[in-house]
């Protein structure tokens, strides 16, 4: 099993960026996506031919605003999640911001504003390439506020995801990190969600995470524990299913 990806970018003014992602791989199942442990490593699959995976254009508007427009791009591309952890698995690297940071791809547009002194705010939209913002389409909207104090940070993210009908799922994620002078960082995240249209006994979701990482020798050592994605309520209670990892990279 293998996956290959190359990211190309260029600038027309020195302040903008045109980004194109090309990938290939043979790791997909017959259903078209990876399952099991391999899915955690974001291995491209589906075609061994080189394909265009995403195209986006990012540009400034004035001195403090940045705008992005893209295809097969996340609506949260300009969001800031206060998390210093970045391990090998996709799930724990989300830092419990599983659904609020909308990542459903498709056509996307977003904007971020830098207020200065570490405070930023951003909004984003993502939906299918056809039927954008219609009653029949499954659209996603999100907003994010973050503060970065240099060695610590906080962020609050809200996401609203529509299904093909009239129901709407909403999620709110809170993230924080702190970096010590020794180079060790601690990150934590917590997300709650409400499944629109679901019965009262199964309409809540929860995700949480805590991770530690820092420089050790020539590389980085880290470990984390958290829920296996977003856990949905069952029978009036949210089940506890955890995953953990430890890594060393150099």
Predicted regions located by residue number:
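Beta-barrel outer-membrane channel/assembly domains of diderm bacteria
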Residues: 1-74, 89-128, 137-150, 157-161, ...
